Amino acid sequence: MIQLENIEKHYESKKRRVIGVDQVSLDIKKGEIYGIVGYSGAGKSTLLRCMNVLERPTKGRVFVDGIDLLELNNKQLRKARQSIGMIFQGFYLVSSKTVVENVSFALKAAGVGKLERNKRALELLNLVGIEDKANQYPSQLSGGQKQRVSIARALANNPKVLLCDEATSALDPSTTKSILKLLKKINEQIGITIVIITHEMEVVKEICDRCAVMQNGKVIENGKTYDIFSDPNEKLTKDFIHTVLDFQLPEALLKQCNGTLLKLQFRGDIAAESVVSDMLQQHKVKGNILHGKVEYIKDKPLGVFIMEVSGDPSEISSAISYLEERIKQVEVIQHVSY
């Protein structure tokens, strides 16, 4: 649905050139929810704005639904943008207009008649769950309700793509979850492709099928969300994931441990209890699981357990080798010499 080919965006000044996006290529599939995560200044919002040419790339090509947007004239580009909805952190609602008028405004700009505008706007407010707020003004709404109006407005012209620029960063955790749930519902009901820009890995974990990690204008890692979480390659990616999957043991508990500490990661359908039980039966070691947690990413389990193992060093070494064969990801956190 969206193909970016070697996108670069430069900002020139008298003193220096700033590179906002640096040779980024992405292929975002039709109907998926794609996340782009990075810290402030990573270039993710600039990249998102290149997707609908609100920012014109310095180099590269942008295809949306097979159309090269950079080859269009201004009139053609305005027409093409009707198939690309966009929501922002700041909502940008017209304070002097009611909720239904804010949604209708996008339809009016597209030349839709008044009766049809009103009907469509009410349908969209029903879709996003605030049909009862139709005649209220933005000042009477909560932050989550305002974002729902923004989503309804962005969907007014039946777009094929919805771009979300930090759409939940101004919301509290509970409201964020409700907005993400709404976006997922919309994706499932109408099959719209959604691209989400965020600095929160929790957002990516919650709804994204695939994701990319940006740093200094570059995409440093990308792939299926589950694979990124279960086997990250880059340090920045690992740092982001630790904000969601924090399995660190308290220092006081670490000091009480006399054996070798292992961090075991279980993916998919591998049963942690079975693997650990088999290991203890086949090796002359004692084991004690100190901490464990299972997260579900796109309905697939990802488990991490901290285990203390004690016994003869050679048996411990053999037990670790056995675990590595069964579950692949085994990390020795603390090794005790006997």
Curated annotation (Swiss-Prot):
<dbReference type="InterPro" id="IPR003593">
    <property type="entry name" value="AAA+_ATPase"/>
</dbReference>
<dbReference type="GO" id="GO:0005524">
    <property type="term" value="F:ATP binding"/>
</dbReference>
<keyword id="KW-0547">Nucleotide-binding</keyword>
<dbReference type="Pfam" id="PF00005">
    <property type="entry name" value="ABC_tran"/>
</dbReference>
<dbReference type="InterPro" id="IPR003439">
    <property type="entry name" value="ABC_transporter-like_ATP-bd"/>
</dbReference>
<dbReference type="InterPro" id="IPR041701">
    <property type="entry name" value="MetN_ABC"/>
</dbReference>
<protein>
    <recommendedName>
        <fullName>Methionine import ATP-binding protein MetN 1</fullName>
        <ecNumber>7.4.2.11</ecNumber>
    </recommendedName>
</protein>
<dbReference type="GO" id="GO:0016887">
    <property type="term" value="F:ATP hydrolysis activity"/>
</dbReference>
<dbReference type="InterPro" id="IPR045865">
    <property type="entry name" value="ACT-like_dom_sf"/>
</dbReference>
<keyword id="KW-1278">Translocase</keyword>
<feature type="domain" description="ABC transporter">
    <location>
        <begin position="2"/>
        <end position="241"/>
    </location>
</feature>
<keyword id="KW-1003">Cell membrane</keyword>
<dbReference type="InterPro" id="IPR018449">
    <property type="entry name" value="NIL_domain"/>
</dbReference>
<keyword id="KW-0029">Amino-acid transport</keyword>
<dbReference type="GO" id="GO:0005886">
    <property type="term" value="C:plasma membrane"/>
</dbReference>
<dbReference type="InterPro" id="IPR017871">
    <property type="entry name" value="ABC_transporter-like_CS"/>
</dbReference>
<comment type="subunit">
    <text>The complex is composed of two ATP-binding proteins (MetN), two transmembrane proteins (MetI) and a solute-binding protein (MetQ).</text>
</comment>
<comment type="similarity">
    <text>Belongs to the ABC transporter superfamily. Methionine importer (TC 3.A.1.24) family.</text>
</comment>
<keyword id="KW-0813">Transport</keyword>
<dbReference type="InterPro" id="IPR027417">
    <property type="entry name" value="P-loop_NTPase"/>
</dbReference>
<keyword id="KW-0472">Membrane</keyword>
<dbReference type="InterPro" id="IPR050086">
    <property type="entry name" value="MetN_ABC_transporter-like"/>
</dbReference>
<comment type="function">
    <text>Part of the ABC transporter complex MetNIQ involved in methionine import. Responsible for energy coupling to the transport system.</text>
</comment>
<keyword id="KW-0067">ATP-binding</keyword>
<feature type="binding site">
    <location>
        <begin position="38"/>
        <end position="45"/>
    </location>
    <ligand>
        <name>ATP</name>
    </ligand>
</feature>
<dbReference type="Pfam" id="PF09383">
    <property type="entry name" value="NIL"/>
</dbReference>
<dbReference type="GO" id="GO:0033232">
    <property type="term" value="F:ABC-type D-methionine transporter activity"/>
</dbReference>
